[in-house]
């Protein structure tokens, strides 16, 4: 996860989003596929985590809470990570709202994606069989005067410490283990993610 934003060179082509047509008493009604899935309380977090994406995801969660505060929300994650502040706005909303947020990793959940994956409701965090998870410490690149660089370096160390504390809380690992294991990029398979405490089980097929 990065301390400052990075441009996603593989931004999705929204023209390729399929439409779903439903018959209603008033005739046909068409939705884009993601809006239709939102009716089923399914949200997708795909691509780099950045401010625009975070705004959309938090808005969807708040909308679903307003519709029904008792029903679970399902957050599907396929992300290489992204900006810490954007990710933390999603994290705080997940913890703030009344419905449980079930997280499901498909493809990959790396960096901030992994952090959000493990932040789901206990017992409701899943990986699909061939997905992968990667955890590491926050990344930062700064330029400018030496004093400013020092200020940013101190801030990123504070962010690192806070995120390690939260990871320890959600995984059940000790803070020392989290600090050691995130010192470098650490990749985990779906099964290893269960063993580590990042998720609760591997989804192979719907019941």
Swiss-Prot record:
Q: Which family is it part of? A: Belongs to the peptidase S14 family.
Q: Name the Enzyme Commission number(s) assigned to this protein.
A: 3.4.21.92
Q: Which residues are responsible for catalysis?
A: 111 (nucleophile), 136
Task: Please give the superkingdom of this protein's source.
Answer: Bacteria
Subunit: Fourteen ClpP subunits assemble into 2 heptameric rings which stack back to back to give a disk-like structure with a central cavity, resembling the structure of eukaryotic proteasomes.
- Per its record, how is this protein called by name? ATP-dependent Clp protease proteolytic subunit
Q: Which SUPFAM superfamilies match?
A: ClpP/crotonase (SSF52096)
Which one Pfam family would you cite for this protein?
A: CLP_protease
The UniProt function text for this chain reads: Cleaves peptides in various proteins in a process that requires ATP hydrolysis. Has a chymotrypsin-like activity. Plays a major role in the degradation of misfolded proteins.
Q: Name one GO cellular component term.
A: endopeptidase Clp complex
Its catalytic activity? Hydrolysis of proteins to small peptides in the presence of ATP and magnesium. alpha-casein is the usual test substrate. In the absence of ATP, only oligopeptides shorter than five residues are hydrolyzed (such as succinyl-Leu-Tyr-|-NHMec, and Leu-Tyr-Leu-|-Tyr-Trp, in which cleavage of the -Tyr-|-Leu- and -Tyr-|-Trp bonds also occurs)
């Amino acid at each position: 996860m990065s301390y400052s934003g990075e441009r996603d060179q593989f931004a999705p082509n929204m023209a390729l989003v399929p439409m779903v047509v439903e018959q209603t008493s008033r005739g046909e009604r068409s939705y884009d596929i993601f809006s239709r899935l939102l009716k089923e309380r399914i949200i997708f977090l795909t691509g780099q985590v950045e401010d625009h994406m975070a705004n959309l995801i938090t808005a969807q969660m708040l909308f679903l809470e307003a519709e029904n505060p008792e029903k679970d929300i399902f957050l599907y994650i396929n992300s290489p990570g992204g900006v810490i502040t954007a990710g933390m706005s999603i994290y705080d909303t997940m913890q703030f709202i009344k419905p449980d947020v079930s997280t499901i990793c498909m493809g990959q959940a790396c960096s901030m994606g992994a952090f959000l994956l493990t932040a789901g409701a206990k017992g409701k965090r899943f990986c699909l069989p061939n997905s992968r998870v990667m955890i590491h410490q926050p990344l930062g690149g700064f330029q400018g005067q030496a004093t400013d660089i020092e200020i940013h370096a101190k801030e990123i160390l504070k962010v690192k410490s806070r995120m390690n504390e939260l990871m320890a809380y959600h995984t059940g690992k000790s803070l020392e283990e989290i600090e050691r294991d995130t010192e470098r990029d650490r990749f985990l398979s779906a099964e290893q993610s269960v063993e580590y405490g990042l998720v609760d089980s591997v989804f192979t097929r719907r019941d």
